[in-house]
Swiss-Prot record:
Family: Belongs to the aldehyde dehydrogenase family. Gamma-aminobutyraldehyde dehydrogenase subfamily.
Taxonomic source organism: Serratia proteamaculans (strain 568)
Gene Ontology MF annotations: aminobutyraldehyde dehydrogenase (NAD+) activity; NAD binding
Ligand binding (NAD(+)): 146-148, 172-175, 209, 225-228, 280
Protein name from the UniProt record: Gamma-aminobutyraldehyde dehydrogenase
Known function: Catalyzes the oxidation 4-aminobutanal (gamma-aminobutyraldehyde) to 4-aminobutanoate (gamma-aminobutyrate or GABA). This is the second step in one of two pathways for putrescine degradation, where putrescine is converted into 4-aminobutanoate via 4-aminobutanal. Also functions as a 5-aminopentanal dehydrogenase in a a L-lysine degradation pathway to succinate that proceeds via cadaverine, glutarate and L-2-hydroxyglutarate.
Reaction it catalyzes: 4-aminobutanal + NAD(+) + H2O = 4-aminobutanoate + NADH + 2 H(+); 5-aminopentanal + NAD(+) + H2O = 5-aminopentanoate + NADH + 2 H(+)
Gene: patD
Subunit and partners: Homotetramer.
Enzyme class label: oxidoreductase
Pathway where this protein functions: Amine and polyamine degradation; putrescine degradation; 4-aminobutanoate from 4-aminobutanal: step 1/1; Amino-acid degradation
Active site: 246, 280
Residue ranges crossing the lipid bilayer per the database entry: none
UniProt key word NAD: yes
Keywords for the protein's UniProt record, in alphabetical order: NAD, Oxidoreductase
Amino acid sequence: MQSQLLINGQLVTGQGALLPVYNPATGEVVVQVAEASAEQVDQAVLAADAAFEHWGQTTPKERAEHLLKLADLIDSHAETFARLESINCGKPYHCVLNDELPGVADVFRFFAGASRCLSGLAAGEYLAGHTSMIRRDPLGVVASIAPWNYPLMMAAWKLAPALAAGNCVVLKPSEQTPLTTFKLAELAAGLFPPGVLNVLFGRGASVGDRLTGHNKVRMVSLTGSIATGEHIIGHTASGIKRTHMELGGKAPVLVFDDADLQQVVEGIRSFGFYNAGQDCTAACRIYAQKGIYPQLVKALGEAIGSLKIGPPIDASSELGPLITAQHLERVVGFVERAKALPHVQVVTGGERVNGPGYYFQPTLLAGARQEDEIVQREVFGPVVTVTPFDDEAQVLAWANESDYGLASSLWTRDVGRAHRLSARLQYGCTWVNTHFMLVSEMPHGGQKLSGYGKDMSMYGLEDYTAIRHVMFKH
């Protein structure tokens, strides 16, 4: 099993402390991996900085060819990636292979094409005897920090636009889920020029802080928690680095009386519980208009109760475990505090699963109120709440009354209502009569405490560039 770092084109063993990497389905240690030392962090950044002198001057066509080759390698090693992600994250193998891996390769292919379409603007003459033009140029070294819930996909979301724009990258996966990133490093080592892509491993305090604070790093891109985002913004403030933050979420799902009940139930069953609910866009905060509320709660309870929890290798498993024992206890705490409220009804689930691994039952809590902790805070587990509402004005206010602003959805047959509300929901993405759907061509990113900056799309590519004005006198 590949567990080495990638520094300046070479796979090397970390020189820091040994850290265990667990299989959350069993609680067993899969492998022990050595962190990068402080010297290795510096080596990776300096290698990226040196490589930028050449990589930043390559043509979009050259960069696109590298990204397309990497996409092909991901496709040809898809089963290996899926197996590693399943072991390390506890996800059902078939979900990773069929749902995630095609999207990972597609992101690299999209940005390969997008890089060839990125251009500045020839602006014209705004001062007599002078011609101005606008350039979009790469920034330099980008430090990318990926999360544990989608380690390979988030690595792709960060690497593809940064490399396509002409930057060099030092990527640090979560210390809990590095295995697919190590495999990606192995493939990239023989593909990219030395230093263009570097992969480190370690904890935030020992590796992440040194990486993000390095004076040669021009931009830091994070997908992670709000607390981690706050820390990195503060830690990098003295260096005035550009930051790109995709942080937490608590997606409101607005269900009106005229919604298609079956579509809503099927959508929440899928989109509220994918990856055991460990997703910033999970359909977890349901608001149901009072006319449809009783039927929705009943139908949802039956649908969610039918979800199959099981070993990741089992083709019939729909939910795997939570990522760590600590995170399981966090989810248990949220649910226990909610269950203690007299107005909250446990429709289904609500308990941990006995046995090995960090499993929690898919859970539906009805009658939760707007002010309840379970409604206001991100649980990041297989837990969905349903709250009844009266009318558009009330539910719009409740949906926007949140510190989060990443994703939302509304379910109605009324086109006018859909347009009215989608224009006023304070979220980076709003789906109508669906949820969770992402494509490489469209941007993904948040507002408020959910962060700023966009992943995917041409907007994502532009985020990794500097706008420059060049003026000619003639």
